[in-house]
Amino acid sequence: MKAARLFGKNDLRIQDIPVPEIAPGEILLRTGAASVCGTDVRMLQHGHAHATFEAPLVIGHEMAGTIERIGGDVPGYTVGQRVCVAPNYNPVPSQLTVSGNGHLDPNYRALGIHEDGSFAEYVRIPSHAVQQGNVFPIADHVSFTEAAMVEPMSCVYNAYEKAGTRPGDIVLIIGAGPIGVMHAKISKLAGAGKVIINDVHSERLEMARGIDSSFITIQGDVRDEIKRLTGGAGPDVIITACPVPEVQTLAVEIAAISGRIVFFGGLPKDRAVVPLDSNLIHYRQLVVTGTTRQSLRQFQATLALITEGALCLEDLVTSTHPVEDTEKAIAAMANATGLKSRLAFAS
C-alpha cells in the first residue's frame, strides 16, 4: 500500500509498504478520506519524538473509510461497514477514562501521533481503541470527507461546551482557519446573536464570508471595531483559534463582563508564558479556560449533528490530493492558501 511516512523534521516520504496485519480484536480500515490537521503541519515542520529515521510514522489522525477486515469476533462491526474513527485511546484504564475524560490521560495514545495513522491506504485500528468504542458507524448519506472531519469538529464541540454559548451571545473567534470557521458554524448553530471572525489573512476572511454571509469579519487590529459592534461591552465569548500569545492577552482585555474565554489554539512551548491582567479576570468575573482533543461522547454528538444535517463541513475543503501529494496537501494548510486539505483514496 502507499503511505506517507514521517522520518523526521521536513522528511516525509511516500512509500510502498505492506498492508498492516491485524491481531484478534483489531480492525483493518480501508481509508476513504483523510483530512490534514495543523498538528500534521507542525509534525512535518518540527519533527516528532515518535517519527524517526529508524522508526518512521504514518501520520494523519482524521479518517473515515470502510472496514476491510476484522480480527476474529468483534461484536457490532461487519466487513464493508462505513465508519469513522476517533484517534485517541487509552491502552490502560484509569480514573480519567472512568470519568469520561480519557482524552486528558497523559498516557493516552493516538493514531497518527504515536502509531501509524490515516495518510495511507489502510489503517490498523488497535484492539484497545475498538473495545473503547472509537470506531463509529456512519450513515450512507454522510460522505467520507465529512466523516473524517468529525475529529476536528468534535474538538471544537469540546470548546463550545466549555464556552457555554447561549442564544444572543456575541462570539468573537480569533483565527479564520478551518478550525476558526468550525467554531463560527457551531456558534451560529447555538443561536449566537453575532459571530465575529478576526484574522490577518484577508483571503481566509473572504472564504469565511463565502461559507456564511452572516459572519462578521475583521482584518487586523480588532479593538475599535469590537467596541463598535458590541456597544462598548465586549464579546460574551472569545475563542482563540490561533497559536499567537498576544491574542490570549488581548482576549482578557476585551471580553465582556462575565465573559467566557477559551484558549483553543496551543502555543509554542517557548512562548507559552503569557501576561494576563488578573484584575480584569477578577473584577469582570471572567471565565478563562482551555480545551484539547475530545471525549468519545463529544465525538458521537458531533457525528450526530452532521448526520442530522445540522452541521455541514464539506464547504471547508478547499483542496483535494492523492496520497502521493501529501506534502502538497500539508503545504496548502501551512501557507494559509485555503481552509481544509484532504486526501482522497480510491473506493
Show which residues each predicted segment covers.
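Mid-domain Rossmann-like dinucleotide-binding core that forms the NAD(H)/NADP(H) cofactor-binding site
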Residues: 79, 83, 140-220
